[in-house]
Curated annotation (Swiss-Prot):
Similarity field: Belongs to the MscL family.
InterPro entries: Mechanosensitive_channel_CS, MS_channel, MSC/AndL, MscL_channel
Membrane listed as a keyword: yes
Any GO MF annotation of the entry: mechanosensitive monoatomic ion channel activity
Cell location: Cell membrane
A GO CC term assigned to this protein in UniProt: plasma membrane
Membrane topology, from the record: Multi-pass membrane protein
Transmembrane segments: 14-34, 67-87
Subunit structure: Homopentamer.
Protein task: Channel that opens in response to stretch forces in the membrane lipid bilayer. May participate in the regulation of osmotic pressure changes within the cell.
Name of the protein in question: Large-conductance mechanosensitive channel
Keywords: Cell membrane, Ion channel, Ion transport, Membrane, Transmembrane, Transmembrane helix, Transport
């Protein structure tokens, strides 16, 4: 069981996924800071409130806190744009890498037929 676990962990996909999750967590913190400390104050200048997360309205006893939702939407769009740009860059890099030509696997029977043909040609010359 330990051997299987080592093989599972050693596969590239698991390691790539782990790296992606760690980088994603760090990136989320950066985007949240960008939104909270730069974008929201800029939007707040026009709305008259710097902290969008406190935006809300009430209907009767119900309070709708839409400011946090706006923050989440802004965060989502920032992440989506960055991921889109990264995917475009990665696709461009992958396209520019020359592909190694794959060796054609010759069918064994075709190989035998070619050898027989060559032998028959040699016999015909004699």
């Amino acid at each position: 069981m330990i051997k299987e676990f080592k093989e599972f962990i050693a596969r590239g996909n698991v390691i790539d996924l782990a790296v992606g999750v760690i980088i994603g967590s760090a990136f989320t913190a950066i985007v949240k800071s960008l939104t909270d400390n730069l974008i929201n104050p800029l939007i707040g200048i026009f709305l008259g409130k710097v902290d969008l997360s406190n935006l809300k309205f009430s209907i009767g006893d119900a309070t709708f806190k839409y400011g946090s939702f706006l923050n989440a939407i802004i965060n989502f769009f920032i992440v989506a744009i960055v991921v889109f740009i990264l995917v475009k860059i990665i696709n461009k890099v992958v396209k520019n890498e020359p592909e190694e030509p794959e060796e054609e696997e010759v069918d064994v029977s075709a190989q035998y037929l070619e050898e027989i043909r060559d032998l028959l040609k040699e016999q015909a010359k004699k």
